[in-house]
A protein has these predicted regions:
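An accessory alpha-helical subdomain
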Residues: 135-233
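Rossmann-fold NAD(P)-binding glycine/threonine-rich loop
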Residues: 92-136, 140
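Glycine-rich adenosine-cofactor-binding loop
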Residues: 15-38, 50, 162-172, 176
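Glycine-rich, highly charged phosphate/nucleotide-binding loops
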Residues: 61-80
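Short, hydrophobic beta-strand segments that form beta-sheet elements in well-ordered domains
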Residues: 26, 45-50, 109-111
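Short beta-strand and adjoining strand-loop segment in the mid-core
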Residues: 45-47, 82-92, 128-137, 150
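Glycine/serine-rich phosphate-binding loop and adjoining beta1-alpha1 elements at the start
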Residues: 1-19
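NAD(P)-binding Rossmann-fold cofactor-contacting core
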Residues: 35, 43-60
Length: 233
């Protein structure tokens, strides 16, 4: 986030959380609740509590738990065990009551109106790459996301896959963390690795691996094939 001139601005800490075992409870069954359920169910368990549900919520109920309840009568018990609560009913006063009770219980709250204590960013996910974007202006957030999506070509996805595969080998070949970081930087700065990614993933991988083994690097530069180098190991 970039801080505006407004002195009341409070910066938020960007985090990537493992939500696979953390429950998100959404109060309300309308379009907003549907949108939230579609997002959060990609990451972990979701429960939607409402008197009624949109057709899409009902049609995809294998992705989340639907609980029919008159929230005006009882909502407090559904906050038990929740990690994040999302008050998304059409009743603003009810939403405030849910939020107040959640805060009292130590449950995080994602508001659907206004800025709460949990802000859901705009997310770009391509392969093993995840980028989260947030600004104070939704239009700017969307603009940034579109620009970044244009820049995030398949080569970057290939590089993420390549480095993920190479990382365990680097730990064995290069004991020192600083030396490993230096090797990764040299891979990222190697134009030949990037060029090969567009033609042959395996050749790009062997070229990248050679940064950890100087003798292999010298042989590649001299014209040895990646296949011969692989047999030499």
């Amino acid at each position: 986030m970039v801080a505006p001139d407004d002195c009341s601005y409070r910066p938020f800490l960007p985090l990537f959380l493992d939500m696979s075992q953390r429950l998100v409870v959404i109060f309300g069954g309308g379009k907003v609740a549907e949108r939230k359920a579609l997002l959060f169910s990609d990451y972990g368990p979701v429960q939607v509590v409402s008197q009624s549900f949109t057709p899409k919520l009902l049609a995809s109920k294998d992705r989340w738990e639907l609980t029919e309840c008159d929230l005006r009568v009882d909502f407090k018990r559904y906050l038990q065990g929740a990690f994040i609560a999302i008050p998304a009913t059409s009743n603003s006063q009810l939403n405030r009551s849910i939020e107040e009770e959640a805060i009292r219980l130590g449950v995080l709250v994602n508001r659907v109106e206004g800025r709460g204590e949990v802000v859901v960013p705009s997310i770009i996910r391509k392969g093993q790459i995840s980028i989260a974007i947030s600004t104070e202006v939704p239009g700017l957030t969307r603009h940034l996301r579109l620009r970044l999506e244009e820049e995030l070509t398949e080569d970057y996805q290939g590089m993420a896959r390549l480095l993920g595969r190479l990382r365990p080998e680097l730990k064995e070949l290069i004991p020192g963390q600083e030396d490993r970081a230096r090797a990764i930087r040299s891979i990222l700065e190697d134009k030949e690795v990037w060029r090969l990614l567009g033609h042959s993933y395996e050749k790009a991988y062997m070229r990248a691996r050679s940064h950890a083994c100087q003798d292999e690097r010298d042989s590649l530069d001299a014209g040895d094939s990646p296949h011969r180098l692989h047999r030499r190991d």
